Regions:
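Catalytic cores of DNA base-excision repair glycosylases
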Residues: 2-9, 13-239, 247-263
């Protein structure tokens, strides 16, 4: 199958629909990793605010690694599962102390870190390092399903992976950057309408076009076999657990080395 018409369409729509989000103005893998985790369960508009607040509080992977558990959980409140915050801290500790603050770029090393699955690993690789890979995220699924599987129900990921892999461009021949490890910042790097056909610009186009499709057509990602509907928060165990954590934090009873409580 000739994928060039599909790629041209996605690139064109990506330019038209580009979202100038704050985590797109950095190549710092810590900042990009944080955005990937926050976006797993929270709307983009809310993440825009909370991402900045988090980085004001924990500006680098070292700052997060050295922070207390209670402080991390307090900063995470209202952002979904507390275990994601605990995994962020645990992974930050490994990156800071086992990797001297330098993020690994290989998928097998990234997924070995707490809380980092294949999609998050590929997001870090694409957006921080411009490396090619299979970034199979819900908006990416939406685009592929809408155009290439328009009438097919329950499409398994194994059928999507080869297409996502084939359409992702190769990385640049050279990638030069310098990281201020202490400050955790690489400076501004905006890529709207990026002329280079790179993994980073390609997946931005896929994400933005997919988000647009979800608002304008019946959600194609529901036809993915991997699709799961988020359970209601009201009256759920997640709500009870979040309330317990808030109470413990307010009372100062969630100390160092303590995990957030379980609700069964």
């Amino acid at each position: 199958m000739d994928m060039n018409p599909f790629r041209t369409l996605v690139r064109t729509e990506g330019v038209r629909l580009y979202r100038d989000l704050p985590w797109r103005r950095t190549r710092d893998p810590y900042e990009i990793w944080l955005s990937e985790v926050m976006l797993q369960q929270t709307q983009v508009a809310r993440v825009e605010t909370r991402w900045v607040e988090w980085l004001d509080r924990f500006p680098s992977v070292f700052a997060l690694a050295e922070a207390g558990t209670a402080e991390v959980l307090a900063a995470w409140q209202g952002m979904g599962y507390n275990r994601r915050a605990l995994a962020l801290k645990a992974a930050a500790e490994q990156i800071a102390f086992d990797y001297d603050g330098v993020f690994p770029t290989e998928v097998k090393e990234l997924v070995a870190l707490p809380g980092i699955g294949p999609a998050t690993a590929q997001g870090i690789r694409a957006f921080a390092f411009d490396l090619p890979g299979v970034y199979l995220e819900t908006n990416v699924r939406t685009v592929v399903l809408h155009h290439l599987f328009p009438d097919v129900p329950s499409v398994p990921d194994k059928e999507l992976v080869p297409i996502v892999e084939a359409t992702c461009p190769a990385g640049l021949d050279s990638f030069e950057t310098s990281i201020d490890v202490d400050g955790g910042s690489l400076g501004a790097y905006a890529v709207p309408q990026d002329e280079d056909d790179t993994p980073r610009s390609w997946y931005y186009a896929m994400l933005d076009y997919g988000a647009h499709l979800k608002k304008t057509v019946p959600n194609p990602s529901r036809r993915a076999k991997a699709y799961t509907r988020q359970s209601k928060f009201e009256g759920s165990r997640r709500q009870k657990r979040a309330e317990i954590v808030r109470m413990l934090l307010a009372a100062g009873e969630l100390g160092e080395g303590m995990d957030a409580p379980s609700v069964h």
